[in-house]
Amino acid sequence: YPIHYLLKNKPDIIIGIEKYEQAPAANFANLDAQYFYEYARRGFGISPSNMKLLVDEDANLINSLGIISKWLPGKIKKNETELIIFFAGHGLASNDGKELYILMQDSDPDLLSRTALSRTELFKEIISLKPKSVTMFMDTCYSGVSRDEEILLASARPIRIVVDEQEGVPD
């Protein structure tokens, strides 16, 4: 089969947020999402009816939750569907660093648990749909600063990976 035939029915959720209501801009994130959409459509042959593109103002929490909770379940066939998710924008960690959040366009960095998308909850919801596979492109970091070094949240703590010296580095 040609690759277009194999990929055309893959559902894609593509989100890119440059302009935030309450956070500094994530430069070019909206363009990254639009380019990914075009690449998926033209390069992979994925049907626009199987793709949801949310950019800037459209990428608010309500719209994002609607796609994940209403649109996506109708597109997933258990153990058959291969899902693609692309996100470009800001992420933040909770003050204690235990929870990671994806900032939507209207998220308030001071009210993460109420206004941002929990990465853990997103993963749980996707796993509960039982797709065959999930490919995620997450162009976000959880450092608490933008590319221009603007602070997203005064109390934000960066997430760092620390190697346990006793365990060593895996082969």
Language-model regions, residue ranges each:
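Signal peptide-proximal N-terminal region
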Residues: 35-50
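Active-site-proximal C-terminal subdomain of hydrolase catalytic domains
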Residues: 16, 33, 55, 131-171
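Acidic/histidine-rich, surface-exposed loop or edge segments in extracytoplasmic proteins
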Residues: 12-22, 48-50
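Caspase-like (clan CD) cysteine peptidase catalytic core
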Residues: 62-88, 92-151
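Short glycine-/polar-rich loops that comprise or flank the Walker A/P-loop
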Residues: 9-10, 47-50, 131-133, 170-171
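Pro/Ala/Gly-rich low-complexity, hydrophilic intrinsically disordered segments
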Residues: 1-11
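Glycine- and acidic-residue-enriched helix-capping/strand-helix junction motifs
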Residues: 20-34, 38, 112
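Short beta->alpha junction loops
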Residues: 51-61
